[in-house]
Design a protein with these regions (language model features):
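Multi-pass alpha-helical transmembrane bundle typical of ion/small-solute transporters
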Residues: 3-224
């Protein structure tokens, strides 16, 4: 019986049983690319320019924490963008709920230039100042990793994966493993700052280089 001829409660039940409309993710990906581009550009604005009359060579040497933090954050955002791109190769479309989750993912990404600047500016002020800065920095990246896991769980549970990925146990297992371990790894990286802040920063830099490694990407081409 057509819905308009049925009792109102039946129409309401049928509408609730229907899945969310799946639409193209093109605009979502374009918006996300813009956020990534802005965040990665803002990083350089926090590197201080030597003042006129200042010893430029000495000033540049003293700015090494800013340069190291910049490189680490630049590569980290590049890694996040790459993973975001690769995730969307197995996403067949988006829904209102998936849009909301993606917005939450972009929030800590847009925020990352701030903890990067805090780390660089307070590096020489003692461990009691640097450790909280590194915890904020690492916590921000860990939050990104957590939101990637939420996105993966949402997409896989709501039927948003393309048929090949949805039917591949290997892809699903790999996605579950990676998106489960990544938040833990970044939390441990942040905790390493309690031992030595430079160790924590090196861990984050090493992770970014590892994730971006061409050989690793080639070996895991089917990875979500």
């Amino acid at each position: 019986m057509p819905c308009h001829l049925s009792p109102p409660y039946r129409c309401a039940m049928e509408s609730r049983e229907q899945p969310e409309d799946v639409v193209s993710s093109a605009r979502l990906e374009t918006f996300a690319d813009g956020v990534f581009a802005i965040a990665i550009t803002l990083l350089v604005l926090e590197i201080r320019i030597p003042d006129p009359g200042e010893n430029v060579s000495r000033a540049l040497v003293d700015l090494w924490p800013s340069f190291l933090a910049y490189v680490t954050s630049f590569l980290t955002i590049g890694t996040i963008w790459t993973d975001h791109h690769r995730l969307f190769t197995v996403i067949r479309g988006t829904t209102h709920g998936f849009l909301f989750v993606n917005i939450l993912l972009l929030m800590p990404i847009a925020f990352l230039p701030y903890p990067t600047a805090v780390v660089a500016r307070h590096w020489f002020e003692g461990k009691d100042q640097v450790v909280p800065a590194m915890l904020l920095y690492g916590g921000t990246i860990a939050l990104v990793a957590i939101m990637f896991r939420v996105m993966w769980l949402y997409a896989s549970s709501r039927g948003l994966l393309v048929a090949e990925a949805a039917s591949s146990r290997a892809v699903r297992r790999r996605g579950e493993l990676i998106y489960r371990l990544a938040p833990l790894i970044y939390v441990l990286g942040a905790a390493a700052s309690v031992i030595d802040p430079i160790l924590s920063l090196i861990v984050f830099l090493g992770l970014a280089v590892y994730w971006l490694s061409p050989s690793r990407r080639g070996a895991n081409s089917s990875r979500p």
